[in-house]
Amino acid sequence: MANFVLNAQARAEDKQGKGASRRLRRESLVPAIIYGGNAEPVAVTLELRELVKALESNVFFEEVVEIKVGDKVENVKIQALQRHPAKNTPMHADFKRA
């Protein structure tokens, strides 16, 4: 069972792209994507503080994580994490379905 549970919100197509991602980051949100398996990729938004708290544990990178998107739960593993070069805060995360 997953030790980490993150709450996410699905992003509409008009909330995707460079400008929209910058606006999300200013609101302390992190854009992310969930892909893999037989399902279509899903663009989501995570809370920065919630993601940073999970990243404090090295186990987060090795175990399956549950992401709740609305009423659906996705079991995923982190595939890639992009950080700000100076601040070291997460800028974008890629999750692959487990």
Swiss-Prot record:
Gene3D superfamilies: Ribosomal Protein L25, Chain P (2.40.240.10). InterPro entries: Rbsml_bL25/Gln-tRNA_synth_N (IPR020056), Ribosomal_bL25/Gln-tRNA_synth (IPR011035), Ribosomal_bL25_short (IPR020055), Ribosomal_L25_dom (IPR029751), Ribosomal_uL5_bac-type (IPR020930). It holds the Pfam family Ribosomal_L25p. GO terms for biological process: translation. It comes from the Bacteria. The keyword RNA-binding applies. Belongs to the bacterial ribosomal protein bL25 family. Part of the 50S ribosomal subunit; part of the 5S rRNA/L5/L18/L25 subcomplex. Contacts the 5S rRNA. Binds to the 5S rRNA independently of L5 and L18. This is Large ribosomal subunit protein bL25. It comes from Acinetobacter baumannii (strain AB0057).
